[in-house]
UniProtKB/Swiss-Prot annotation:
InterPro entries: Nucleoid_associated_NdpA. Transmembrane segments: none annotated. Belongs to the YejK family. It is found in: Cytoplasm, Nucleoid. It comes from Proteus mirabilis (strain HI4320). This is Nucleoid-associated protein PMI0825. Keywords: Cytoplasm. Pfam families: NA37.
Amino acid sequence: MSLDINQLVLHQLIKRDEQTLEVVLRDSLLDIEPVVQEMVEELHRVYSAKSKAYGLFNEESELAQALRLQRQGEEEFLGFSRAATVRLKDELAKYPFAEGGTVLFCHYRYLAVEYLLIAVLNSCNSMWVNDSLDVSSTRYLDIPHADIIARIDLTEWETSPDSLRYLTFLKGRVGRKVSDFFMDFLGAQEGLNTKVQNKGLLQAVDDFCEASDMNKQERQTCREQVYSYCNEQLQSGEEIALTELAQELPPLGDQNFAQFTEEKGYELAETFPADRSTLRQLMKYSGSGGGLTVNFDAKLLGERIFWDPATDTLTIKGTPPNLRDQLQRRVSEK
């Protein structure tokens, strides 16, 4: 992995009791030893694989102001990280769920892009067996389950300050306001909404098919082409580019798909990340509620599956063998 660590430091937040959160600050940067390199590479892999939200700094963001000074050489990275950790402690102490953790600040370069990654990592207890086959306890950083992480694309922030996506973060587990305090600490707000962009794309595809007067088979083929392209982008870690997608679809007269979306005002970004759950709607219908879960390929609608909107009735012709066996066994019990 071509990941080069420029500067890295760790600090500690320790919860002494329900009311006290203590901060322990390191006095020097870490030496970039192999184990440190391995830790950052793992954190980079874990973070890159997770679904992220996009954001940007508020005008009054203290962190952004301090980071700008650090980037201009007016403050050292260590001093910047120490002051930021104290601010994080003060922000975190406002919340009843406040917990301690290891606070990581890492400035690194990956594929010619500079990043600042900030994370609060939990430690877990475990056991290990030594060479004498004795069992001992140990503690480790729970990087795979880290959910308090933000990453600033320093390159984009400095070259495109009006961007809505130079800051990414994890929204945290359901039921915890993790992202709330972290966003307050960062002085940031949500920017590009990937789900909204992907839903807008789906609507644009449907409208494009309608405007092109496509029949049912042509519409299904069009949706499959869109899904195929978007899924390839998702798998390769690339973004959806409207100009590239337009090359996969037949034009509407003298107008391609990208021109169609611009003229109709869908407000889609030229490029944006793919959202797996939203794009799945191109290929499948699914829903659940009231003890019922339904999931089927979109191409089956009108062939084996029929919906009557007047009575809100779904008719299925030909059930899956395993479902049919279960139903037959239940009927035979009567």
